[in-house]
Amino acid sequence: MASPSNDSTAPVSEFLLICFPNFQSWQHWLSLPLSLLFLLAMGANTTLLITIQLEASLHQPLYYLLSLLSLLDIVLCLTVIPKVLAIFWFDLRSISFPACFLQMFIMNSFLTMESCTFMVMAYDRYVAICHPLRYPSIITDQFVARAVVFVIARNAFVSLPVPMLSARLRYCAGNIIKNCICSNLSVSKLSCDDITFNQLYQFVAGWTLLGSDLILIVISYSFILKVVLRIKAEGAVAKALSTCGSHFILILFFSTVLLVLVITNLARKRIPPDVPILLNILHHLIPPALNPIVYGVRTKEIKQGIQNLLKRL
């Protein structure tokens, strides 16, 4: 492992990631549940992707959106968790300057895209439940294609400046990052330049994007709840509430943790440093591990598709 750099004049060529500065001895114990969650997330999302790709009956707009969500989850897990486990298991804390900013870009980009995908999926469920007769004419393959373009375009416009703003800074306050990942504010705090604009941009962009997505999701599920409560069939209300409720709780966890991370990164001196670090790791593991179960395995068509796939093997 490379030694920390304290030379304020030498250009930084790599950073050292210090996970849980106050609980270093706990890292080996923490690695086991993280490894299990990582394997669950990768296995479940890969299975869902393959099933939707190979099962012709699942070639529908909703399942295309599920495929996009699974792909985003896989990339997010692979971007963050292997490096975290390498730190825990082998003490491989160094990360090169380009690799750090590449990780930062992918994390910001794919988290932004995932938030937008949740919003599009909430709209899909709103149309399916509140306007079922119009669903085939509104939620089409063309709609999904336009939604994907919107997700990517919005991400490029908003997320790309984050690593660019950090990469342009001069780093002269050492190379030790008190985090397990290269988050924007954790890295920029090592700069000897003024980072006020970086902090302001992340705060405004984070609250604007995630807040607007969450508001639209809440509105969609509010209309869904209103329609569901009118259902007279026995057991139908409980089933619908169970399905939509689990969707909404998972989305709420995803969005709330992101917004909390924006706040804790800006108020780091008032909050124990290990709290946002743990939240960051769990945020890259729990939603990817649960998304395929909540959105996929609990769906009758997905379960049937997996069974058909297993029969072919």
From Swiss-Prot:
Glycosylated residues in this chain: N6, N184
* CC per GO annotation: plasma membrane
The residues forming a coiled coil are none
Q: Would the keyword Translocase be found if you checked this record's keyword annotation?
A: no
Transmembrane stretches in the record are: 29-49, 58-78, 103-123, 143-163, 200-220, 241-261, 277-297
So which stretches are on the Cytoplasmic side? 50-57, 124-142, 221-240, 298-313
SS bond list: C100-C192
PROSITE patterns in the record:
G_PROTEIN_RECEP_F1_2 (PS50262)
Q: Which PANTHER family match?
A: OLFACTORY RECEPTOR 56A4, OLFACTORY RECEPTOR 56B1-RELATED
The UniProt family comment states:
Belongs to the G-protein coupled receptor 1 family.
What is the designated name of this protein? Answer: Olfactory receptor 56A4
